[in-house]
Amino acid sequence: MRIAILSRNENLYSTSRLKAAGEARGHQVDVIDTLHCDIDIASNNPKIRYMGEELPQYDAVIPRIGASITFYGTAVVRQFEMMGTFCINESVAISRSRDKLRSLQLLSRKGIGLPKTGFASRPDKIQDLIKNVGGAPLVIKLLEGTQGIGVVLAETNKAAESVIEAFMGLKANILVQEFIEEANGADIRCFVVGNKVIAAMKRQAGEGEFRSNLHRGGTAQLVKLTKEERATAINAAKIMGLNLCGVDILQSKNGPVVMEVNSSPGLEGIEKSTGKDVADMIFEFIEKNAKPNANRTRGKG
């Protein structure tokens, strides 16, 4: 098969692992820089040009779209869809999951466990917003943040008010969420491919830190999921319409709660902590499912 990986940097761990895994299975794998793709829109003749040349027809595309280029990246993925190419994650599913507020609204509609969350453009009383999620300690998140950037733990109501006022002064969109203290700075990353959790790791925040992201110095180890955690991850992926994603779960006193569904999860942490060949399993899924015009919109909203 001829397969394209959309990635800004072919030397990144995830990109290089995917390329190597695909080639080891006998596929031709091309790494394409998303921002160097030009979209040609013509009636009944959609095309993509790359570095001035028309791209060939690919059997499948693996999008690795960074948060900073979501709009353009999903436009490129959508153009591949118009050309009849199988995309492991559809453009609409990537957009859906990348919007933190939208994804939480859709997950809540289907009864997925979530932390109490508030959102307001200009609340009449900031104290009411804080009260509605249970008061301090609480977490304040920028809607556009990634890898733990733009996430603040406010330990008192007064501190929460100050942070919210500061963000609002910058006209930033924020979420206010209850702090799941019993998680003790740990979360679980479930790596979902198709309708299966193929690997899972428990990430522990570093000393004095509450964010467990590996980019922020957290550590990771293999973890065995409960049936409830596994079902939560699979259902969250289905609701987002993603064939490939990382579902981040916290263990709360009320059961598992979903913090995020990541449409472009990194492979390094999950492969090294679990010893599983995740990249190979991704290509196994593609081989079974990639057919011309096989994309069918999954998820709603």
Swiss-Prot record:
GO molecular function, a single term: metal ion binding
Gene Ontology biological process terms from the UniProt entry: protein modification process; SOS response; translation
List of residues binding Mg(2+) 2: E260, N262
GO CC terms of this entry: cytoplasm
Domain ATP-grasp, residue spans: 104-287
Residues reported in the UniProt entry to bind Mg(2+) 1: D248, E260
Binding site for ATP: K141, E178, F179, D187, R211, S212, N213
Catalytic activity, EC: 6.3.2.-
Family: Belongs to the RimK family.
HAMAP family given in the database record: RimK (MF_01552)
Protein name: Probable alpha-L-glutamate ligase
Organism, as annotated: Vibrio atlanticus (strain LGP32)
